[in-house]
Amino acid sequence: MILLQQVWLPLPNRPSTSPPMSVAARSTGTLQLPPQKAFGQEASLPLAGEEDLAKRGEPDSALEELCKPLFCKLCNVTLNSAQQAQAHYQGKNHGKKLRNYYAANSCPPPARMSSVAEPVATPLVPVPPQVGSCKPGGRVILATENDYCKLCDASFSSPAVAQAHYQGKNHAKRLRLAEAQSHSFSDSAEAGQRRTRKEGSEFKMVTTRRNMYTVQSNSGPYFNARSRQRIPRDLAMCVTPSGQFYCSMCNVGAGEEVEFRQHLESKQHKSKVSEQRYRSEMENLGYVQ
C-alpha cells in the first residue's frame, strides 16, 4: 500500500516559461532603441586629410574648411550620404588633390620627405660613354649585322630577327634610296668636273686668241693698233687702252668684237652675272657674308 501511494502521488506543477502579461507589457514598455544620429552627424567619418593632420600633429584649419562632411571643396564634389563621403575621402582622386594641396603649400608630410631623401644621399659616379655593349668583365663587344642595322637604325634580339629584317620590304626600300642618292652624288661630281674642264679650255682658247692679236709696240700703253676701228657704245666700258676687249668679271679677253660677244653669250659669263647680281641684292638687304 505504501508503494502504491508513492507511485500515485500528484506531480507538482512546473512553472510556465512564458512570462505573465504584465511582465511582457512592462518589458515591451521599457525597451528603448538607441538614439538615431542626425543626417549631418552620420557623415562624421575619419577623413584622409584628418588622418594626415593627426600624423603631422599640426591642425590645418584651411584644410578642415575645404573637407566638409557632405561637401569637398578641394575636389568640388557634393556628397549625398555617409557611405559616399567615406568612399570619396578614401579614394585616389581625393588623395591626389590632397598631395597637390600639400605641395602647393610647401608642407609635404615628413614620411614622404624621408623616402625621397634616401636615394639622393647615394653618390653618383659618372660612367664614361662607350661604343657597343660592355660586359662586367670589362670586354667591349662591338655590334654586328645580326645585332644592328645602321641603314634602318634598328636593333635585333637574335640572328633570325635580323635575317627577317634584311629580307623585308622596309630594308629593301631604304637600300634603293641609298643607292639612288649615291648615284646622284657621283653624277653631280662628274658633271662638275666636266664643267671645270670646259671652262678651263674656253679660258685658254680665248687667251691664246687674245695673244695672237696682241701687237708688240713701244709707242706706250695707250697705243691702239686699230684706232680707226669703230667701237660700239654697249662695249665701250669693256675696251682696254690697248684696244682689246676685256671682261673683268670672268677675267677673259678677246681681240675681236665677234669673239667677245660670243663670250658674253656663253653660259660661263651668264652664270657669273647672275651670281654677281644675287650678291649685290643680298648686300642691299643687309645679308653680308
Swiss-Prot record:
Residues 180-202, 265-289 are annotated as: Disordered. One of its GO terms (cellular component) is nucleolus. Interacts with dsRNA. Pfam families: zf-C2H2_jaz, zf-met. Residues 265-282 have a biased composition (Basic and acidic residues). Acts as a bona fide target gene of p53/TP53. May play a role in the TP53-dependent growth regulatory pathway. May contribute to TP53-mediated apoptosis by regulation of TP53 expression and translocation to the nucleus and nucleolus. This is Zinc finger matrin-type protein 3. InterPro entries: Matrin/U1-like-C_Znf_C2H2, ZMAT3, Znf_C2H2_jaz, Znf_C2H2_sf, Znf_C2H2_type. GO terms for molecular function: RNA binding; zinc ion binding. It comes from Rattus norvegicus. Induction: By DNA damage in a p53-dependent manner, and by 6-hydroxydopamine (6-OHDA) in PC12 cells. Highly expressed in brain, gut, lung, and testis. It is found in: Nucleus; Nucleus, Nucleolus.
